[in-house]
From Swiss-Prot:
It comes from Bos taurus (Bovine). The gene is PAAF1. Interacts with PSMC1, PSMC2, PSMC3, PSMC4, PSMC5 and PSMC6. Interacts with SUPT6H. GO terms for cellular component: cytosol; proteasome complex; U4/U6 x U5 tri-snRNP complex. This is Proteasomal ATPase-associated factor 1. SMART domains: WD40. The keyword Disulfide bond does not apply. It comes from the Eukaryota. Inhibits proteasome 26S assembly and activity by impairing the association of the 19S regulatory complex with the 20S core. Protects SUPT6H from proteasomal degradation. The modification N-acetylalanine is found at A2.
Length: 392
């Protein structure tokens, strides 16, 4: 992770023709950047280009959609993946959020063009348009069933939609500012929202009622995450008897990524604080990796890994560039992160190289969603990209 490798965003097209070239660079912190290039020496019988690297770089392996390159001087290597397919017809403008259903069949996305749409994950074909929010939709996600969608908008409303007929079945009102992120508790009888009004609220989907303000922190809540706590963590007990409408909140932690540089963690049912961590800049996003490990990303490009049992000192801080960390997602034995400079990368515990998802050219990648070995990203350039991971 020490010295990120970067590559020309359209390297796969560039290296498909004879003598085609693509640039390459290595960025060791505090040292001069190393620049290099890849050159296509011809196309093999299998349709795979034969590629050589300039001095200081080595091509370890190449396929039609991936190239594994290392920089021995800095002892780093990255496997760059080109998109398997790109969907350009879902939206006309920047795509702010996306999710894939639990069965992998459907995608949902929201855009700066004001729309929220459900589409077929295999080919990007439009299925439904979800209309009803005033102003932009900030976040959208499927419930675990894959048949229902939860969305939050700048109109301070949370809505629940049927993916089958696009009807809005529930609207939650109570926030006084735009909703920036949501999380689903357990199987989805309850949901959590974080807002620009500085509050995180717990909602009862069945009665479309607010079950309580879980946190009121006076600062915009940019990201929320709910996770099951490890048995060793004392979540505290609630001061009042929880409503019988609260379902699945016990033994859960709530994580809040705040604009005031604070990362807040509390017991979801107990409402009791677990820790408050101060970072280098505004926190944009957060996720749980396990019952005690979590990740949170900041506006100045830091990814903090913290242990809830000892949150004062980060387990590690990953910094690859100063670009804002836009999204974080737990994936297999590691995570996927996306940043405001178009980089999107996968870190796995047992891999000694980073997997880079390429294609975005300096445009922020706002959100990542996965289904099995497929990874979907959405970007300011208005494209949804689908990547196919070979065996990790």
């Amino acid at each position: 992770m020490a010295a990120p490798l970067r590559i020309q965003s359209d390297w796969a097209q560039a290296l498909r023709k004879d003598e085609g070239e693509a640039w390459l660079s290595c960025h060791p912190p505090g040292k001069p950047t190393l620049y290099g290039s890849l050159t296509c020496q011809g196309i093999g019988l299998d349709g795979i280009p034969e590629v050589t690297a300039s001095e200081g770089f080595i091509v370890n392996e190449i396929n039609k959609k991936s190239i594994h390159v290392s920089c021995p001087k800095e002892n780093v290597s990255s496997k760059f993946l080109a998109p398997y397919t790109t969907f350009s017809r879902i939206h006309t403008k920047s795509i702010t959020c996306l999710d894939i259903s639990s069965g992998g069949g459907l995608g949902v996305s929201s855009s700066a063009d004001g729309s929220m749409k459900i589409w077929q994950a295999s080919n990007g074909e439009l299925r439904r348009v979800l209309e009803g929010h005033v102003f932009d939709v900030n976040c959208c996600r499927f419930f675990p069933s894959g048949l229902v969608v939860l969305s939050g908008g700048m109109d301070a409303q949370l809505k629940i939609w049927s993916a089958e007929d696009a009807s809005c079945v529930v609207t939650f009102k109570g926030h006084k500012g735009g909703i920036l992120d949501t999380a689903i508790v357990d199987r989805g009888k309850n949901v959590v929202s974080g807002s620009r009004d500085g509050t995180a609220r717990l909602w009862d989907c069945g009665r479309s009622a607010c079950l309580g303000v879980i946190a009121d922190c006076g600062s915009s809540i940019n990201g929320v995450a709910v996770g099951a706590a490890d048995n060793s963590i004392n979540l505290g007990s609630p001061e009042q008897m929880p409503s019988e409408r609260e379902v699945g909140t016990e033994s859960k932690m709530l994580l809040l990524a705040r604009e005031d540089k604070k990362l807040q963690c509390l017991g979801l049912q107990s409402r009791q604080p677990l820790f408050l961590f101060i970072g280098s800049d505004a926190f944009n996003c957060c996720t749980f990796l396990s019952g005690f490990l979590l990740l949170a990303g900041t506006q100045d490009g830091n990814i903090y890994q913290l242990d809830v049992r000892n949150p004062r000192t980060p387990v590690q801080v990953i910094h690859r560039s100063g670009a804002p960390v836009m999204s974080l997602l737990s994936f297999r034995d590691g995570f996927i992160a996306s940043q405001g400079d178009g980089s999107c990368f996968i870190v796995q515990q047992d891999l000694d190289y980073v997997i880079e998802l390429t294609g975005a050219d300096c445009d922020p990648v706002y959100k990542v969603a996965t289904w099995e070995k497929q990874i979907y990203t959405c970007c300011r350039d208005g494209l949804v990209r689908r990547y196919q991971l070979s065996d990790l």
